[in-house]
Structure formats: C-alpha cells, structure tokens
C-alpha cells in the first residue's frame, strides 16, 4: 500500500517546517552534486531559509559568477541595473589601464623588450629621451636655486661683517664706553665716601642680611 499524496502547502508548525526544510534541502543538494558528476553539468543552487540563512552549491569546475555571466550572455536578460554595469565597465577599464602602465614601466626599466618591434622601440627611445631631458632641466633648476641661495647668504654675511667693522672703527662707540666707565667709577667712589662718613653704629654689617634688606 503506497503513501498518501502530500498536500503542497505551507507547514504551519515551525518545528515541523524546519525539519522538512532541512531534509528537502539536503536532498536537493545531493541531487545537484549527482547531476554535476554524472552528467558533467555546471550546476549552481542557492537556497535561503525563512530565517535568512543561506545554503549554496556550485559545481567544482566553475563558479557562481561565471555561471551568472554565462546566463546573462545566453538569455540576454539584465541581471544588473545600468548603474552597476557602468561601474563594472569602469573597473575593467581601470584594470586594463593599470596593466598597460605596468607593462610600460617594465619597458622603461629595460625589461621584457625582446618582443617589441622596431616602431615600439622607437617610441620607447623617445620616451626615455624626453624623460632624461626633463630630469636634466629639473637638476639645472635646482642648481640655480642653490646658487642663488648661496649668493644671498654670502651677501648677508658680508653686510654683517661690514657693520661689525663700522662698530669697531666708530669713535662714538669708544666715547660712549669711556663715559660709561667714568660714570661707574665716580658712582662707586661716591658710595664709598658716603659709607666712610657714616657713624659706625649705623653701618650695616655683612653678617646681618635682614638689616641690610631693611636699609
């Protein structure tokens, strides 16, 4: 006696629904692996549970991205909106430019030039000559800047030396220094004379700093 036909509808009991999902999911994954091996087919399966958890299978000989790209080409259906397609094209363009620049850089270093033809070698030679010329111009500009800087420093040094010589030769400076010396001498002499005239009782002794501060 065979099993009764199961009605296909949503299982209300959450526990039973989870058990059924696990069994059916494992069955689908098993069938996908079998057809992939037995028939050498490219198979990809993606399952999202009601909880949001994802399970997937893809044939070992391919990837999901390759299969989606193949599907896009064969079906003609848009899997991505124009904005994402433009971004993908821009990424590919930048990658190609980067690869091209890496090749040019190796050529400028003298690497991988055996495969270049005569015209490509001439272009490479022109690029090297232009680069060498620009480098020499930059070096000459730097040398000129250094010379100008050294000249300015030398002029400033000479100006300072001239001012120092003028200060030594100017008699006014000697007069000022002499007058200051005479003033200091008379000032100290006056103080000494004043202290000599003070009574002994009013003189501040060196060993009494407190009294000296008050005086």
Swiss-Prot record:
This protein's source sits in the domain of life called Eukaryota
| Location within or outside the cell | Nucleus
- Keywords in alphabetical order, please: Activator, Developmental protein, DNA-binding, Nucleus, Transcription, Transcription regulation
Disulfide-bonded cysteine pairs: these are: none
Single GO MF annotation: protein dimerization activity
Q: Where is the K-box domain?
A: 84-170
Q: Which residues form the MADS-box domain?
A: 3-57
Which InterPro entries did the record assign? MADS-box/MEF2_TF, MEF2-like_N, TF_Kbox, TF_MADSbox, TF_MADSbox_sf
Q: Name one Pfam family in it.
A: K-box
The biological process GO terms on file are: positive regulation of transcription by RNA polymerase II
Q: Which Gene3D superfamilies match?
A: Transcription factor, MADS-box
GO CC list: nucleus
Described purpose of this protein according to its UniProt entry: Transcription factor involved in the genetic control of flower development. Acts in conjunction with DEFICIENS (defA).
Q: Which PANTHER family does this UniProt record tie to the protein?
A: SERUM RESPONSE FACTOR HOMOLOG
As a miscellaneous remark, the entry gives: Mutations in Glo cause transformation of petals into sepals and stamina into carpels.
What is this protein's record name? Floral homeotic protein GLOBOSA
């Amino acid at each position: 006696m065979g099993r009764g036909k199961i009605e296909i509808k949503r299982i209300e009991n959450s526990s039973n629904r989870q058990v059924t999902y696990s069994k059916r999911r494992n069955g689908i994954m098993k069938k996908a692996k079998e057809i992939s091996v037995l028939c050498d087919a490219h198979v990809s399966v993606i399952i999202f549970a009601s909880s949001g958890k994802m399970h997937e299978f893809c044939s070992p000989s391919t990837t999901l991205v390759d299969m989606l790209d193949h599907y896009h080409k064969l079906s003609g259906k848009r899997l991505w909106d124009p904005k994402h397609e433009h971004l993908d094209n821009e990424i590919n363009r930048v990658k190609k430019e980067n690869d091209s620049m890496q090749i040019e850089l190796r050529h400028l270093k003298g690497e991988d030039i055996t495969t270049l033809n005569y015209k490509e070698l001439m272009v490479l030679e022109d690029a090297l000559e232009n680069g060498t010329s620009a480098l020499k111009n930059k070096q000459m500009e730097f040398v000129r800047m250094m010379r100008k800087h050294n000249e300015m420093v030398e002029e400033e040094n000479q100006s300072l030396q001239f001012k120092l010589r003028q200060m030594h030769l100017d008699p006014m400076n000697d007069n000022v220094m002499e007058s200051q010396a005479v003033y200091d001498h008379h000032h100290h002499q006056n103080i000494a004379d004043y202290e000599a005239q003070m009574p002994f009782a009013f003189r501040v002794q060196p060993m009494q700093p407190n009294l000296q501060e008050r005086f």
